[in-house]
């Protein structure tokens, strides 16, 4: 099980992992909000590996006694994603410009506060002296859902992870507006082995390896932990 913000990464590296481990025939992924996945694992859903987009959600699983090992392998920061079809394109320059007071009628989405991407957004809004109520017109259960709505033009903009915005912008699916370091926030990415299997350990070792981390940082815009 893995945070939805890792979907593009795992799709990209899956063949490389299998080539390096020919005895493993395949990997099955289940993506969603880290908080939702953590609750499922604690409640007994079967999984061999958990990749979380926050320390808090990983601790939920760890404190329930479900983890055999936990490693921090990357971190991410927030970014404003703008729909390429938005009439507000060019007028969205900072957090304040996401409000109706600056851009009347603008439609903005955030992840729900219980999801790591929503918690990250809350910290950014607080740092910018703003609030969720002043910005959000709708809430998404995961960053994947929020990104899709922005790309399709259902929303003008939203606060997502830098890695997701970079991936979309490189493909002409969105535009990115950087959030200043003084206002921005970070979230850590953690991997946990949940079952005592040699194959599971090989997969965890791969995520902690230099090749995977280099791909994360160079190709997808994640940061070193």
Where are each of the predicted segments found?
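Exported/periplasmic ABC-transporter solute-binding proteins
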Residues: 1-22, 28-30, 35, 39-43, ...
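Central helical "cap/lid" subdomain
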Residues: 65-71
